[in-house]
Curated annotation (Swiss-Prot):
It is found in: Secreted. Its EC number is 3.4.21.-. InterPro entries: Peptidase_S1_PA, Peptidase_S1_PA_chymotrypsin, Peptidase_S1B, Peptidase_S1B_tx, Trypsin_dom. Coiled coil: none annotated. The active site is at residues 75, 113, 193. Belongs to the peptidase S1B family. It is an enzyme of class 3 (hydrolase). Residues 1-36 form the signal peptide. It comes from Staphylococcus aureus (strain bovine RF122 / ET3-1). This is Serine protease SplC. Keywords: Hydrolase, Protease, Secreted, Serine protease, Signal. GO terms for biological process: proteolysis. Pfam families: Trypsin.
Amino acid sequence: MNKNIVIKSMAALAILTSVTGINAAVVDETQQIANAEKNVTQVKDTNVFPYNGVVSFKDATGFAIEKNTIITNKHVSKDYKVGDRITAHPNGDKGNGGIYKIKNISDYPGNEDISVMNVEENAVERGANGYNFNENVQAFNFAKDAKVDDKIKVIGYPLPAQNTFKQFESTGTVKSIKDNNLNFDAYIEPGNSGSPVLNLNNEVVGVVYGGIGKIGSEYNGAVYFTPQIKEFIQKHIEQ
């Protein structure tokens, strides 16, 4: 082959590689800017609290509340049965906190979209701290209450398949509270169903059930943990 042709081909390849790298960097930077505008950050280490209190379903989120007990939504639990599995705080790594079988599902009898699951204590696949659920997953405590304008955060797995089960945190404020419903403006997407809504002390004030995926929306909703909701949860915590 002509030496000049080889040199030109190598130069063209170098330029293409360089441009591709630049494009990838631009896409990544654009995504980071978009997330910053939404007050969303990717969690780097899910083995520390509060991130290790969150669990993943195939297309939704849940979180631990005391021994072997998980909270999520009824519209999530309806797709699961006893013996199905959940994964503890993955972050692109399905075995990060262990994989556990569900052994009981209790849906709230009212209209509120909340469900309590109990899982087997011993993992099907071990986590970073062994096979025990309670050693790999740190449970949240209930907040005493919440009020309008409180700062909150939502932790979960938005678009889990697309984001390869990476965990994200979004921040915002409480916009309204009425009965068992809490509205907030932290950004959420499909997959955030079942995410904990936490105050600045990382105490849980509610569980996300839905939203409209719009920046600044005040219509993202959570089941607010009123005394009657807390009582239901307490009755279904494994003793």
